[in-house]
Amino acid sequence: MTVGKRKLSNGTVNEAKRLDDHVPVVAPSTNPDFENANGEDNEDIDDYSSEGEMSPQLENYFPQTTSWQKTITKVVKSVVSIQFSHVSNFDTESSAVSEATGFVVDSERGYILTNRHVVGPGPFCGYVVFDNHEEAVVRPIYRDPIHDFGFLQFDPKDIRYMKIEQLDLRPDLAQVGTEIRVVGNDAGEKLSILAGFISRLDRNAPDYGTLSYNDFNTEYIQAAASASGGSSGSPVVNKEGYAVALQAGGSTEASTDFFLPVYRPLRALQCIQQGQTITRGDIQVEWQLKPFDECRRLGLTPEAEAAARSQFPDKIGLLVAELVLPEGPADGKLKEGDTLISINGTPIASFISVDEILDEQVGQSLKFVIQRNGHEVSFDIVVGDLHSITPSRYVDIAGASFNDLSYQVARCFCIPVRGVFINDGSGSFELSPFEKNGWLLEYVDDKPTPNLDAFVEVMKSIPDRKKVSISYRHVSDFHTENITVIYVERHWQSTFRMAVRNDSTGIWDFTDIQDKPLPAEEPVPQNAKYIDIPFDDPEKSGCSQLTRSFVQVRTIAPVPVDSYPYRREIGYGVVVDAANGYVLVSRRFVPHDMCDIFVIFAESVELPGKVVFLHPNQNYAIVKYDPKLMLADVKTPKFSDKPLKRGERAFFVGYNYNLRVVTDDVKVSSVSSINVPVASLSPRYRGTNLECILLDSKLSQECDSGVLADYDGTLRAFWITYLGETNCDQTNDRVYRMGLDVTDVMSVIKSLHENKVPAGLRILDAEFASMTIFQGRLRGVPQEWISKFEEVCEDEMKFLAVDRVSAPALGQVATPLKTGDIVMSVNGSIVKTMRDLGIMYNQDSLDFVVIRQKKELHLNVPTIDTSTLNTSHVVFWCGSILQAPHHGVRQLIEKIPSEIYVTKKNSGGPANQYGIATNSFITHVNDTETKTLESFVSVVKGIPDNTYIKLRLVSFDSIPVAISVKTNYHYFPTFELKKVNGEWEETEHKV
């Protein structure tokens, strides 16, 4: 991804975006070197004489390349490619890895000038690469609160093989018609040289959209140079080699580029060089440069216009107040539409003059003279400190991040610069799946949070696992107050810390605010009232109390393991044992046991739950709650001992998309052997080797949860949801809604009735799929076996064949089954359906008769212990989440390269910056083999911080690769989550 060229959608409206990807290099179609005066290609012009000399016709038209060559030779030795990461969300910016351009402005001290949107407002880590491919670590030393420039610093001693050149800043040399070159990392190509001519000096700052960084209160320079992503921070140089401007953005629909004048960067550089504080003043007013004709329409008098034109003959307009922020220094004094005439007696016609005056008068009262509706009015306004309304700290807690509201955001929506801003609405503060930032907190647990300090004190008083109400607004809809209840989770994500920017070191210093949260409050017994299902038909009255067997199950999965794509899910489960407190629920809603579970009764009472069992094949989980805490009349339903058959009728009770109870008379249309399709790009758990019930009811497909029952209330099947593949554009996950026969679950239910959780369940580590008799004949099944099948099959006559064989886990023996084997019998019994394989759950091995390549084989097939299938160890390292390959991975791969599987990575971490791919396997660290997570941790915890290490990886497609990764333990410490005696424990490894 390449940050850099932030381009407008067109040259006339204030819409813009950053180009975040490499842009293919295309030969420009408007190169003046190859066009005639009419703009047509010069293919038919005799450009050169027969002696090889340039024709007189074009002698003066071509630029003097010799002088430019000398200039460029010097410039390229000052230009650097910046490889960087914004490691954390902060203010308007999200964590990201990117590249851009900068150039040396002080070779002795190692100062580099680049854009503010490159340095970023938050934590920054990066390095620069010089023209000779030497690199140096850089640290940010200044980022301007408003204008799009910042400074990085490197150690000049790190560059040993090249003389570093520096560019002098000469903003005064930027003139209309000046020929310029933009030298930088255009389109991520490290070095590109783009030509153009300055066409404007007085453009208003481009607008890149709301909730994004925007420059304002400054002129921009315009030129046509066709720069693209990665060119941000490039020097704009004239023929003499002076930097006359700084590349910042451009149009997305034209070749137009926008450059920042370097007046304020020059002043900031001089302050840094002299060890002085860079003062920045502001009155919280956004000005726009408007032409004189528009100023007249807004109330500028002819006399004032004449005076301005006389004083500034080269100017085309004046500054007009576009926005006055509430509660700012100018609030109640200046108004939108006021035309600025002077400040403290100094006539004003440019942003540069305003900056020069305000920056030197912070804290002072200045006299502003404006024209309003044909009248001249003056006000005394105290200049505020711009740094004081620019956040320089943030708080991490409960998986989310917060900072004080910034001037940047407040200006976009014309709101006061105060409040707690959610820059990363994740974890407990995930208020919308679509909007991660832009929220302002007003109350937490009914206590006001006017600023970050007040918010910290409120959060310190809230126990772990408590549910509290919050009041909040979105800055884009400030009229609407939102109130909701959140779950404060601080056991999976225990961090509660303050990060403060340290300009002397360039890093952000962390301070732990609270080592441990207050202990969770103990739940108390509660009662709830159920409302039964009303029926006019007395024959169905036995189903009226089935709602007493349903509970709502809410899941929070804070750690993205096993490639499960969701963090929060809501579904319904069935109480299969009310006396002992057991609930059966789809693994679509409870994917693994690394989550918090809440069981809600009668839409009224909520109790904590715990995952105690995960079926490896049949897509259901068992959740336990404490029945002593539920005083309501929860019912254990009756269970049938007869499997449903095709054509049978049943009564459907389910919960639809609105979580409302619906009912329907249904008929079983099919009972089929099914495997849920795979999500190949992100392998995850899915139901396999299933015998599923399909219905002819449209209503059932609107329900994620439910049951099939007889009219007397006896349960025949559970209606559950199966998570399947991802659609073609990777935006949505396909789900399947099917029935699971009660008889297929009864062995587990009987154990639960004895208050025993099934343990030691065993399975065949292979997938089977149905095959028609016709296909079996073609593949060599003899008539003898076909006749046996025809004698015993009652419904569909189909064989089962091995569809896929899982890769064995470390230390496991591979199954003798092979893809394509057609199963005839198991332990002497003919296999007609998936249900006939159910004997595997309590057998160490099974005797198979299969047809393979038209030959009959007798195989003894071992089963595997499923107690090791569930994830029990997770490692967080350099922004990546590592775990042993879960069962969904092993089902789709032939061989496991190692037990270190990359399941997720942070967008701003070293793992993303240096190319650790998700769904890959780490096999070696510094050429030391690391087969397991334990061996990996043992090696990396001895590697110092800020050190390059070599990793060898193998992709999911078995392609080996070697990369180098630089550790960053300050922002991305190494820690583990490990399941010990049924409980998860966290261990941090400090270097």
Curated annotation (Swiss-Prot):
Region entry Disordered, spans: 1-57
Region (Serine protease): 86-269
Record's keyword annotation contains Lyase: no
Keywords in alphabetical order: Apoptosis, Hydrolase, Nucleus, Protease, Repeat, Serine protease
Subcellular location per the Swiss-Prot or TrEMBL entry: Nucleus
Domain PDZ per the UniProt entry, residue ranges: 296-374, 885-957
Keyword Protease recorded: yes
Enzyme Commission numbers on file: 3.4.21.-
SUPFAM superfamilies: PDZ domain-like (SSF50156), Trypsin-like serine proteases (SSF50494)
Active site: 117 (charge relay system), 148 (charge relay system), 231 (charge relay system)
UniProt cross-references to InterPro entries, sorted A to Z: PDZ, PDZ-like_dom, PDZ_6, PDZ_sf, Peptidase_S1_PA, Peptidase_S1C
One GO MF term attached to the UniProt entry: serine-type endopeptidase activity
Any one GO biological process: cellular response to heat
Record field: compositional bias (Acidic residues): 38-50
Stated role: Nuclear serine protease which mediates apoptosis.
Similarity comment: family membership: Belongs to the peptidase S1C family.
Protein name according to UniProt: Pro-apoptotic serine protease NMA111
Source species taxonomy: Eukaryota, Fungi, Dikarya, Ascomycota, Saccharomycotina
